[in-house]
Amino acid sequence: MTYIYNIYMSYSRGNLDRYIDQRLNRFYDQLISQRYAYSIPGIPGIKGDKGLTGSRIFLRNGIPQNELGTNGDLYINLLTDDLYFKNDSFWSLVGNLRGEKGEKGQLGIMGYKGEKGEIGSQGIKGMKGSDGLNGSTILFGQGLPRPYEGENGDVYIDKNTGIMYKKINGIWIPQVGLKGSQGDQGYKGDQGSKGDKGQKGEFGSAGFKGDKGDMGQKGETGAKGDKGDKGEGSKGSKGDVGNKGDKGNKGDKGIKGDKGSEGIKGDNGIKGDNGTKGDNGTKGDNGTKGDKGDIGDNGIKGDKGDIGDNGIKGDKGNKGDNGDKGNKGDKGDIGDKGMKGDKGDIGDKGDIGDKGMKGDKGDIGDKGMKGDNSTKGDKGDNGTKGDKGDNGIKGDKGDNGTKGDNGDNGTKGDKGDNGIKGDKGDKGTKGDKGDKGTKGDNGDKGTKGDNGIKGYKGDIGDKGIKGESGANADKGDKGIKGDKGDKGIKGDDGSKGDKGYNGEIGQKGDNGEKGDNGEKGDNGEKGDKGEKGDIGEKGDNGEKGDIGEKGNKGSKGDKGEIGSSILFGQGIPSPDLGNDGDIYIDDNTGILYKKLNGIWVPQTDIKGEKGDKGESGQSANKGDKGDKGNGGEIGNKGDKGSKGDIGDKGNKGDKGDGGIKGNKGDKGSKGDKGSKGDKGDKGDEGIKGDKGNKGDKGDKGDIGSQGIKGESGSAVFKGDKGTKGDKGNKGDKGNKGDKGTNGDKGNKGDKGSKGDKGTKGDKGIKGDKGDKGSKGNKGSKGDKGDKGDSGDKGDKGDKGSKGYKGDKGDKGSKGYKGDKGDKGIKGNTGSKGDKGSKGDKGEKGSKGNKGEKGEKGFKGEKGSKGEKGSKGNKGDKGDKGFKGDNGIKGNIGVKGDKGDSGIKGENGLKGDVGDKGIKGDKGNEGDKGDKGNKGEKGNRGDEGDKGIKGNKGDKGIKGSEGDKGIKGESGSKGDKGEKGNKGYKGDKGDKGNLGIKGDKGDKGIKGVKGTKGDKGTKGVKGTKGDKGDKGTNGDKGDKGIKGTNGDKGNKGLEGDKGNIGGKGDKGDKGDKGDKGDKGDKGVNGDKGSKGDKGDQGTKGETGLSIKGDKGDKGEFGLSIKGDKGVKGDQGYKGDKGDKGIKGDKGDKGIKGDQGIKGNKGDKGDKGNLGDKGDKGIKGDKGIKGDKGIKGDKGIKGDKGIKGDKGDKGIKGDKGDKGDKDDKGNKGDKGDKGDKGIKGDKGDKGDKGDQGDQGIKGESGASVFKGDKGDKGDKGDKGDKGDKGAKGDKGDKGDKGDQGIKGESGASVFKGDKGDTGSQGDKGIKGESGVSLNYVMSYYNATPGNFSSPVPVGASIAYVSTVGGGGGGSYFRRLNVGIVGGGGGGGGGALFRLPLSVMPGQSLSGVIGGPGLGAADSTTNATKGGDTIIYYGQYTFIAGGGNPGINSAADTASFIKGGDGGTVTNPLLTTQPTPGTGSTSTGSAGGNGQMSFYCFSGAGGGAGTSFTSSSGGNVGMFPGGNGVTTTYNNAGSGGGGASAFDKGGNGSIRFNPPSSGTKGSGGGGSVQGGGGTIPNDGYPGGNGGPGFVSIDYYSS
């Protein structure tokens, strides 16, 4: 049977000491005592309000930092077992859980049972406290927990072994054994004085009729029974003899327990009214939060734009406003509910809650004290029959019965004597009286009470002595405990056991009252979020102004995140048990586990040395405990007193006080968010002015656009993805971004006239190969344009020197992706005006020198980016830089208005993409992630233009191929889709640097196919890895110049994109050549306005972590989180609107264009593409002929700009792919090239702002995702604790902005990853994989000692190892003929055993060598060596496989195969059984077995005659094949498999046996056909050597 208890803990020094010292150490013993008292649940009371969120417990290495956790939380230093308590924002050392083993104390004198304390006056009903978080559930059972049991965070205690498991990510992971060493049994306390009990006994004489039964023998006298008439009382006097009443066992009759009806006390349950709070559900009004739309104001964040333009994302920081969602936080007010503590009275019922402690329940034994039940004794009246004469003496026992009358509880005091009473204990049945407990239902609130356990329960631990109670009489001693019973009053709460009704919590509705907070609902108006309006002038965002009053605490926010749960169980926790962040304590071993990323990882052993039973102390005085009766004001809980005994558990009830958290108070009005203030007109996007100096990275803005999906996998946290600096010189190949969606297939433009071949610009320096972006979606195959004349392959300009990648500015708001539209501008493409003559393709200008590519370094001034108002602050998340990742890609957010992308304004200057040069800081490329932009490769579509292939020339740069790693880009090949002009297959070249193969692009010209010659470069294909650099794909790097495209910056005016309208003349596209300047794409910055998308940010992290302000989320743990309530104001999240200002982020803008991808939705702008109608312009794609420009692809470094991919729509031009002839223009792919600007993707770094996604923060066990906090608002969901109330979760609605999906996985806090938000462009796909934050791996297969130092930053190690395989034996000539040798057994193995580690320490051990096969008939094969792992005081052994065994008898018909290796896993009480070697002539060796993190080895096949025997299997790895040689009928045995490889095959004549690998066994021998008899065979196969593989991750 599994018992489930919900524990809500409140902490005080005293309670902690009790909880740790008494409860844990004795809990197991109590459980084992099986002294469970069950009370018949009374009628459930109104469901009480949910209790306050409990405190959280942090388990980490080292001293806690004050910024960690919230007041009331606990912190355990796993290195020292020091316990800290947070109070007044500081962590104070409370003590050490590992205490010295105390000397066994002297048995204290059993004190007199104290008087039962007066039932305290009914306390004033406290304010209804906020619903607390659902506490961890403690499950009890026998044996391993079942996967489907419990929820993440729950604890399971295996009563058989004492092992505690915690459920993390659906898996029960062993944590610690609560069961300490069996303490010495305390001395049996002196039996308390029998007490006055006897008084009422007089009547009792009749009572024991049962006892009389004993007298029954005398029954003969029974006839005298007639005399019974005389019994009328006179005989009753004899009742005095009743003392004999001890026999009171008859007391069982105690059923009188019916008195339990008294349970009516349940009236206390009325407290349930609190439950009404359910109205809180109304909180839904908070949904009005829609005002969030106002968030546009948030735009202020725009300042962040300065960040590197991307920084705007920082506005997302406003997301903090999202925090307003916090209004839900008001739910935190429920914290006030803490007052509910009064409900604590019900808490008495809570005692049953204690049942959770079940062990304590033992105290219930005291219930035996229930002697009141003795009252049942009244049944004794039956005893009257006692007159039966002398039996009456038995009657004395009856007196005991009388006690029964006392049972009315009054006598209870006597119960103290109850020790003796113990017999009466049977009467304990009275427990039924517990029904009275019904009142207890009210007790549900009491559950809160469980916290009440307060540890006093620990005293119950003494109850261990109670064990004596088994004698029943001794139990009486336990009775002493009875004093605790006084608390029992609270006991009524005990009925609470019914808490199961918790479902009732639906009542939580009462919480609804908080609903008034709902007022915030007005904020709801925000609903219109409205237009997102014009991202507004981002302009004045500045005011953001009065976030003002924080408004009314607003409706109680969503329930705070459910705190970490503490689960108890016996044995290793099941994987499906508990949630990330939960703690599991193994009662068997005391090991404490924490669930991380779905895995229960052992943390520490809180069991400590079980001190000697310690001084039983003056248990005697325990009596005083009676005072507890006051129970605080809980007092009047009513008469339940009788039940009281069970009540002892009651203390738990007090937890209610935790409620006091109470007034978390009004979060402060937060006031009305104040009018969000008009989102100022987005003011003129302004000149976009010179790109000012990259201002300080503003505060990390709001999560901004949904942002990148962020890491998938279990990443612990992707870490901050720094902002991707400006893509300096063709910056490093960005990470392969996600394959962008195929853009709309552009109209097939007219085939422009083939422009003049531009002069080959100087080949720029091949920038670092950017990370290969994800293979973009294969764009729609544009109509194959007329194959333009293959333009002259322009000289591949010198690739400008890779400028310093400027600081990765904050990824602008992703600016208006729209701008990509201007691609039309694409430099001199000039007005593109009349396609007219296709102009001279302009000069392709000089390609403008590619500007200086200016200092791109500075990424221009990015101008002041206007005032960008103050929002600047959050701007700094800026650095998230780190890919953030991908963030949710959010809703792509509103994509806001993409709107002003037009402003993109100046992109204007882009002007000097010139120095793109700085690329300098590719620096933050850190987020290689941005490579994601490469994702754009999607444009690959332009493969078409491969035509230019021309400049394959610079392929030389390919140098960066190094990034080939990126090969990923090959993915981009996806765009090969463009293959449409299959003819152009050429661009496949983009398949990566595939070598410059890109030039193969010229093949595009396919006419020019001759150029395909460059395909030769394909040889470079090797570089394919660089496909990422595909950018280099020739000077496509200059495409970077595309940078001139940078002027595309003016594109910013994308509004002018209208000009693209001119596109009609597609003809001019020829000038595309200028694409080069794209460099300034930097201006893309203004894209910043996208900022408004920020609102999506709200998704906040789904994660648990605070990640940010989520702090309000309060510590994930049991903490009150209450304050989070304040977050309630989140409602204002609307203000996030200010994020709108984020617009300024526009400066990022340049990249911003990509950023839009987030808005990719805006791809709609592609609508501008509508102008694409002019795609004709693409016709100029012929210009693409300038593919040479592609050289600038180097700019790709700006991949960041990938944002432009958004315009991928432009890809439409790809339609011109028809011009693929000009494929040279593929360089235009370069427009993807703009993706090149992607280099700016560096700005994507700003994507970092998505970092806010980072908030996703912790999904998993994270302690606190860090700032994710804003998601924190989601935190309010926390109240979900009342799960019933979950309704409130509704507020989560804001999540709408899913925005930052943030990290998925267990990441503790993806950190700023959020910034990736801007990625909007899937490009960031960034990194996938295990985001536990992989640190490094260690692998060693050399037999002997090894030591692997734990790397810096690592906290988790996954260890895989195997012992050496056994060697195969030699064949034999026996009477039955030639018998083949037996195969060796496979080694035992450990697989991905999770261990928590600490940098500076080392994992060491011994690697087992291979067993050697028998060399000849005179030698024996040897056993494989054991591989040993030393982990602190634990030793894990992967045993070596055993060798094939030679037979000593000439008459044998087989040679036995070796047995598989064993495994020694300290986590298991029973190790997996190894496969046995085969002994028969046809049966395979036994298969290896599997258990937690380990496998035993399989047995080897037997050597036989006429038949063969294969080795056993392990999982999917088969044993080696046995082989029979028909020449001499000798059959060899195959080696047994290991968990990592198949066994070696047996030998066949003329073919030697195979040796094992990775710990598998070697095959057996047979005659080789040569040599000298009897050693004319092959030596047996050797076993495979053992190895150790350790993967280190940070958590």
Curated annotation (Swiss-Prot):
Residues 191-200, 209-448, 456-466, 474-501, 510-561, 606-615, 622-702, 718-825, 832-883, 895-1041, 1048-1098, 1107-1151, 1159-1250, 1265-1300 have a biased composition (Basic and acidic residues). Residues 97-155, 175-233, 236-295, 299-358, 380-559, 608-907, 920-1039, 1043-1102, 1128-1307 form the Collagen-like domain. Keywords: Collagen, Glycoprotein, Hydroxylation, Repeat, Virion. It is found in: Virion. May be hydroxylated on lysine by the viral-encoded procollagen-lysine,2-oxoglutarate 5-dioxygenase. Glycans are attached at residues 87, 134, 274, 280, 286, 373, 382, 400, 409, 1345, 1420, 1545. Residues 1558-1585 have a biased composition (Gly residues). It comes from the Viruses. Residues 181-577, 604-1326, 1538-1585 are annotated as: Disordered. One of its GO terms (cellular component) is virion component. May participate in the formation of a layer of cross-linked glycosylated fibrils at the viral surface thus giving it a hairy-like appearance. This is Collagen-like protein 2.
